[in-house]
Amino acid sequence: MTEFSKTPLLDTIRTPDDLRKLRIDQVQQVADELRLETIDAVSVTGGHFGAGLGVVELTTAIHYVFDTPRDRLIWDVGHQAYPHKILTGRRDRIRTLRTGGGLSGFTKRTESDHDPFGAGHSSTSISAGLGMAVASDLAGTKNNVIAVIGDGSISAGMAYEAMNNAGAMNSRLIVILNDNNMSIAPPVGAMSAYLSRLYSGKTYRSLREAGKQIGKHLPKLIADRAARAEEYSRGFMMGGGTLFEELGFYYVGPIDGHNLDHLLPILQNVRDADAGPFLIHVVTQKGKGYAPAEAAADKYHAVVKFDIATGTQAKTKSNAPSYQNVFGASLVKEAQKDDKIVGITAAMPSGTGIDIFEKAFPKRTFDVGIAEQHAVTFAAGLATEGFKPFCAIYSTFLQRGYDQIVHDVAIQNLPVRFAIDRAGLVGADGATHAGSFDNAYLGCLPNFVIMAASDEAELVHMVATQVAINDAPSAVRYPRGEGRGVEMPEVGIPLEIGKGRVVRQGNKIALLSFGTRLAECEKAADELATLGLSTTVADARFMKPLDVELVLKLAREHEVLITVEEGSIGGFGSHVMQTLAEHGMLDGEVRMRSLVLPDEFMDHDTPAVMYARAGLDAKGIVKKVFEALGKDKAETVKLA
């Protein structure tokens, strides 16, 4: 029996050039098939799901109307770009998404000419797009630049900085606001679509431009009032465009982002316009076309592998709690005893465990949106008034608020508590989301207390420690995922500041861990013991202030000292070496080595594979020990 393809038109498309050869009445079928393919692919690989389904029609329309990749198409964040990847020559690899050697879960310049700008973090698209548009002007190429940005991303300050700059120029920048939360505009319909098409057309724009020219010859008061009347009438009729008009954009919308009869003519009008910048306001629904995702957008924002028929996700059960949940629960316990504790997150309440705190203390919880800079200084302001703010942010996103950390927190020595989630490698999300650098970029700042939890029980105590620190900013870092399954304390007990602990005593090799690589150090010690190498394993707990007494003792009493951390060069190991150098301990007395992440941006894979490649698993630690000893490992032991 012949098996018929569920995607016959999509099967004919290798590049957007093939799409543009189709009749306009075939575009809807392409979109329908593209949605089916996206659902099927993500059910196999997992990944970001709802956002991609929400832009299927928009993606199809953009590639049909514009001459991509000559016309540049930038996806803000990039997590909604799976349909885009399918249409741009990557369908044959779409079921390798977020796997080792496979396609990235975000846009990536090295992956395709159709990805002119890489992404992962939010709110960068308009700035990058404006740069490309100005470059086109300078080069005389006059190609279009389209930046697609969500209503969450456009709330960030960088987006408004870019729009403010773009509004003062006449470059061919087209911003498409993908509004999937209805946070800006009222419901859309036929009248709105008709008006959008009318206002984006050449006739209306020509009349409007003529009106502007006439206004230049009128008394300023009359001209200003006329312009204001036109602006507000459009804002009233169209629902929400006045802000963008004030920034210098020509606003069109809102329009139904799932109706190609609305999208195609408006995109064509904007494409054929003589100047810019434009902002097209498109309203979409996350998870569109897949009932479980439509019904529970939050649960289907990002998914693991799932059954298409039922929507059931194949989540593995763990006997250990996740670090984010341990943090959230620990903060609740502390806040029950201290009404000065408040929780802050930047649009990541469930990802950081702040949602647990919010359920217990809704009035003491603040989700500031995608605004890390504001989150940090907002926390600083709370600290000046005697409150105890816990600012829970992923390591990779905390980078966005670095000047505020330095200028508003550290210099003023304000006791803001940073809970740094997703520290270290994060796996499938790759380089843009890796928490590789916080050891280095926080460790160089005066006044900070910096901790890393070696397991979930330690995290409980470190949260309690942060509560007790009232005279300095502090940070605790911990990874994504589940803990080790250790016995959990009933309550957190504040740790002695700047003091580590020895978890296993030896006399030949010393392994000093900062963070959750402690478990791999213990495995390495077991293997080294079988080879007759007595090994001490220590948990540093603190990078700053460093336990100098412990570091010097390990260096004096062992032949080899190796530091191990889930961070880049310039972090914990550098602090240890600096200390040893200042005490003359690197003058031939100890063989010191530092295990850190490679000095590169590592591509996505599973965390286990990535750490093994970095030499930060037990096997890599043992190998480093033998390199330090200077012995030929092939003669001493088979490490494979």
Curated annotation (Swiss-Prot):
EC number: 2.2.1.7
Top-level taxonomic group: Bacteria
Gene Ontology biological-process entries: 1-deoxy-D-xylulose 5-phosphate biosynthetic process; glyceraldehyde-3-phosphate metabolic process; terpenoid biosynthetic process; thiamine biosynthetic process
Molecular function (Gene Ontology), one example: 1-deoxy-D-xylulose-5-phosphate synthase activity
Recorded coiled-coil stretches: none
Cofactor(s) listed in the protein's UniProt record: Mg(2+); thiamine diphosphate
Catalysis: reaction(s): D-glyceraldehyde 3-phosphate + pyruvate + H(+) = 1-deoxy-D-xylulose 5-phosphate + CO2
Pathways involved: Metabolic intermediate biosynthesis; 1-deoxy-D-xylulose 5-phosphate biosynthesis; 1-deoxy-D-xylulose 5-phosphate from D-glyceraldehyde 3-phosphate and pyruvate: step 1/1
The entry's keywords: Isoprene biosynthesis, Magnesium, Metal-binding, Thiamine biosynthesis, Thiamine pyrophosphate, Transferase
Cofactor descriptive note: Binds 1 Mg(2+) ion per subunit. Binds 1 thiamine pyrophosphate per subunit.
Signal peptide: none
Binding site for Mg(2+): 151, 180
Ligand binding (thiamine diphosphate): 79, 120-122, 152-153, 180, 290, 372
Any matching Pfam family: Transketolase_C
Subunit architecture: Homodimer.
UniProt cross-references to PANTHER family, sorted A to Z: 1-D-DEOXYXYLULOSE 5-PHOSPHATE SYNTHASE-RELATED, 1-DEOXY-D-XYLULOSE-5-PHOSPHATE SYNTHASE, CHLOROPLASTIC
Protein family according to the UniProt entry: Belongs to the transketolase family. DXPS subfamily.
Physiological role: Catalyzes the acyloin condensation reaction between C atoms 2 and 3 of pyruvate and glyceraldehyde 3-phosphate to yield 1-deoxy-D-xylulose-5-phosphate (DXP).
HAMAP family found in the cross-reference section: DXP_synth
The protein's name: 1-deoxy-D-xylulose-5-phosphate synthase
Organism: Rhodopseudomonas palustris (strain BisA53)
Gene for this chain: dxs
